[in-house]
Regions:
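Acidic, Mg2+-coordinating active-site environments of NTP-dependent enzymes
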Residues: 6-155, 179-180, 205-208, 212-214, ...
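Short SAM/SAH-binding signature in class I
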Residues: 8, 257-260
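Conserved adenylation A10 loop of the ANL superfamily
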Residues: 12, 117, 263-264, 283
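Short glycine-rich anion-binding loops that position phosphate/pyrophosphate groups of nucleotides
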Residues: 15-17, 51-52, 161-162, 189-190, ...
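Active-site beta-alpha connecting loops in nucleotide-dependent enzymes
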Residues: 141, 159, 163-234, 238
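ATP-dependent carboxylate/acyl-activation modules
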Residues: 142-144, 266, 270
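Short amphipathic alpha-helix with an adjacent loop that forms part of the alpha/beta core around
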Residues: 246-252
Length: 286
């Protein structure tokens, strides 16, 4: 029993995270829709209208609100997306109106999240300008795509957790950096069950045309990322030991490089990041 009833529900994505326990993406959708059990009848349920599973949701007892980029029939749509100097700007079109929004982060996945937040604010009867101001003041929390400068190196901390979709999104972010070299440090993605090997390999294949110069993988499952990336990344190394990984990374990094760290929470890839920080002084990028 829910002691409190949420006023608004949000489901941002149906991917393959936790598929080991839920069996299929349909099983994941069913589990996420359990949020309705605690919501008041008629409350807004905000859904990603670009997701093939969420766009099929029909819940007549609730107010369905869709957001997206590709789907022209959503209620909140992002258009004219621009990335520059670590910021992303876009126009939100909604119910015949529009509002320009800027968020201090990059990556199309962050546009989706900002759209969901904008929709929440609107449902709470906030002024669009105030919603935009709030989004502009957003600060990423620890290990969730937080960007730092380590000497002359750009570090993208994004290892709070990982799924196939978020790994690919993180590679998109790394690819967007105008750096001397782009280095990806990718670890195991957990809870993928029978889809694990192919999911890791597909992440590796996703490096095609992403201009990733060096790929380091950590963990037994992530070796399949290395396999998938063959032919797309010039230098690939796999590690089972964090100390060896950290040592190799420190020997490889040069001023002007950008390095991404991404893995599931259980891999504790922040241990490698902390080894890097102990080796060199760092300041915030902004």
């Amino acid at each position: 029993m829910y002691k409190r009833q949420p006023d608004i529900g949000i489901i941002t994505n149906i991917g393959v995270s936790h598929i080991e326990y839920l069996g299929s993406r349909d099983g994941i959708l069913k589990a996420k829709l359990e949020i309705l059990e605690g919501m008041k009848k008629g409350a807004p349920l905000i859904l990603n209208g670009d997701n093939d599973k969420l766009v099929t949701v029909r819940e007549p007892d609730y107010k369905l609100v869709f957001f997206g980029i590709e789907n022209p029939n959503v209620d909140f749509r992002a258009k004219d997306i621009e990335e520059k100097n670590g910021f992303t700007s876009f126009t939100v079109e909604f119910y015949g109106a529009s509002q320009r929004v800027t968020v201090p982060t990059v990556g199309i996945h962050n546009v989706y999240d900002a759209l969901a937040a904008f929709a929440v604010g609107y449902e709470m009867r906030m002024e669009p300008q105030k919603i935009a101001a709030g989004l502009k003041s957003f600060v990423p929390s620890g290990m969730r795509q937080r960007i730092k400068k380590v000497g002359g190196i750009t570090v993208i901390e994004d290892c709070y957790n990982a799924s196939p979709d978020s790994q690919k999104a993180a590679l998109d972010v790394l690819s967007s950096f105008k750096s001397n070299r782009r280095i990806a440090v990718l670890g195991d993605m957990l809870e993928l069950g029978k889809y694990s090997d192919v999911s890791h390999e597909n992440v590796g294949k996703y490096t095609e045309n992403k201009n990733i110069d060096i790929l380091f993988t950590y963990g037994a499952k992530a070796k399949h990322i290395a396999e998938g990336a063959k032919g797309f990344v010039d230098e690939i190394k796999s590690f089972d030991d964090k100390t060896e990984l950290a040592k190799a990374l420190l020997e490889t990094l040069k001023d002007g490089d950008a390095v991404l760290f991404k893995a599931s929470r259980g891999m504790k890839l922040e241990d490698v990041i902390n080894s890097l920080y102990r080796a060199v002084s760092y300041t915030h990028l902004r």
